[in-house]
């Protein structure tokens, strides 16, 4: 853009200089190029070449850019983990407490990656809701693991909102946790309340089924009701007919029994 403007201004200067140089060489006053006409010619040339692209000096200031929004800080679930804590695989090792300070520092969370910190957070959530020390497969433990993963997905998507693949995985994990919470609420309500309280989960009921009413649906519904009523009427008539036949059969059988006893 800058090179184009420079090129056009150079061409314009050369064209104007050529007009005046021809006038000097002829040493005659050109009636067609008076001072006013030359200025008008110059203005016309400027307006012709710079109508679409104004010069850099006279270009108007446009306030089209939107102000940059500051992202709100998303609280991380790993903030409460101290850097002096040992990793999960070394926390239960007695020898890790008596090693050299340099070696012990290498085993802490200060030199741990994100997955190791997330594993320790999962173990902390599991310890809050598990039924006993050896419980690793109950519904409460599964809900705790899924909760840690969901919060990790939320933190990641807050930094990278265009990551559609992880968003899909997060929604699938949320649906799986809803299914487990629904089962736990139906079978063990006391454990369900404990899990929601300890993990900070707000359980919301699924929305009621809603279908938009259309003319086609109304016509189909009216036809189905008409068919249902007709079928019920035919079944009622058939039942009445069967009752009448049964009563006639009983009446005929009762009338023949006294004759047999008299004989």
From Swiss-Prot:
One of its GO terms (biological process) is translation. Keywords: Mitochondrion, Ribonucleoprotein, Ribosomal protein, Transit peptide. Residues 1-70 form a transit peptide. SMART domains: Ribosomal_S15 (SM01387). It holds the Pfam family Ribosomal_S15. SUPFAM superfamilies: S15/NS1 RNA-binding domain. It is found in: Mitochondrion. Transmembrane segments: none annotated. Residues 238-263 are annotated as: Disordered. NCBIfam families: S15_bact. Belongs to the universal ribosomal protein uS15 family. HAMAP family: Ribosomal_uS15_B (MF_01343_B). Component of the mitochondrial ribosome small subunit (28S) which comprises a 12S rRNA and about 30 distinct proteins. This is Small ribosomal subunit protein uS15m. It comes from Danio rerio. The lineage of its organism: Eukaryota, Metazoa, Chordata, Craniata, Vertebrata.
């Amino acid at each position: 853009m800058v090179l184009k403007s420079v090129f056009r201004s150079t061409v314009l200067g050369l064209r104007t200089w050529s007009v005046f140089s021809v006038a000097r060489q002829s040493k005659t006053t050109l009636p067609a190029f008076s001072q006013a006409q030359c200025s008008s010619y110059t203005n016309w040339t400027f307006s012709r070449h710079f109508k679409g692209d104004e010069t850099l000096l006279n270009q108007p200031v446009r306030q089209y850019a939107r102000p940059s929004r500051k992202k709100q800080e998303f609280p991380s679930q790993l903030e409460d983990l101290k850097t002096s804590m040992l990793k999960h695989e070394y926390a239960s090792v007695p020898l890790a407490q008596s090693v050299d300070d340099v070696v012990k520092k290498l085993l802490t969370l200060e030199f741990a990656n994100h997955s190791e910190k997330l594993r320790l957070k999962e173990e902390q959530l599991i310890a809050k809701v598990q039924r006993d020390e050896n419980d690793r497969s109950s519904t409460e433990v599964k809900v705790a693991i899924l909760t840690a993963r969901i919060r990790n997905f939320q933190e990641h998507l807050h930094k990278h909102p265009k990551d559609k693949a992880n968003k899909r995985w997060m929604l699938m994990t949320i649906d799986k946790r809803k299914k487990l919470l629904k089962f736990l609420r139906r079978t063990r309500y006391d454990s369900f309340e404990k899990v929601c309280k300890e993990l900070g989960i707000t359980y919301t009921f699924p929305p009621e089924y809603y279908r938009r009413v259309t003319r086609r649906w109304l016509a189909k519904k009216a036809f189905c009701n008409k068919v249902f009523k007709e079928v019920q009427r035919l079944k009622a008539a058939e039942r009445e007919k069967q009752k009448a036949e049964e009563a006639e059969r009983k009446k005929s059988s009762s009338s023949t029994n006294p004759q047999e006893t008299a004989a």
